[in-house]
Structures are given as C-alpha cells and as structure tokens.
Amino acid sequence: MFIKKDKLRYTSGCADKHPDELPGVRKKSFILPFAGGEIWFEHLDGIYQYTELSIQKLRRDTAIFRRPSSPGYITFVLDETIITEQLISEIADALIKPGKQFMRVAFVGADGLSCKKLKKILYGHGFAIKFFDGIEPAKEWLLNERNI
C-alpha cells in the first residue's frame, strides 16, 4: 500500500538542521553482497525537501554504479525524501543512458504518484522494476531469479 508523502512531515523535523548535516546527505551508497550476488544501494533517503542535494548525490554516485564492473541490480532508497519531477528525471537518465545494462531495479519508499511516473518512464528499457515498502523484500526480489 502506498501513502502519499506529507511534505510537512518531512520538513518539520529538519528545519533546525543545516542541509549538509542531514543523515541522508552523509549516508554513503554501497555494494552489498547478498545471497551469492551483489546489489548496489543508492541511498537518497533522509534528504527531505532538499531536491538539489538529492540530485547532486545521485550524480556523484552515478559514475560509480554505471561502471561495467558494478552490479546489474540496484535499489533506490527514497524514504523521507520528497520525490520531485526533477529527481525522477535524474533517476531515469541514470538508468536509461547507454553504457550499462541493469537487470533489475527496486525502489524503496516511493509514494504512489512517484511509482506511477517512474513506471511510465522506465517501462520497456530492458530491466525489471518493482516498488517496495522495505529493504528486505527488495533484496529478496532482486536476486531471486524465479520472480521476474
């Protein structure tokens, strides 16, 4: 079940913090060995309404997760981040541009409207996509070849 993200919920708790001090900005994205494979976790969570910071972090990490040696399985963790049209466009560009073929892409924490927009943009580009409420089910789906 997807619930529309309440913008006030994500702005009230971080109003007193400088954007560079947010946990989501400091959190590193990484490769996780799991069930005999590897998954790239792109952590864009906890950045709240600071879309430009989310995009900057995504652009820095794109150079890493698009390397030929990087995993073809990727999870975008978007909890506690306002998902804007601009962020959706940046995610799509990172996944679609030539040079790296992804096998499966999971999204964790996306609201219903963002899910629809991402599906519309990413459908038919040669990789499976699915949306989850938590990281554990996303990990299981990414590396379970029977669930395509």
Feature roles, as predicted:
Residues F2-I148:
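Amphipathic, Lys/Arg-enriched alpha-helical "gate/interface" segment within cytosolic domains
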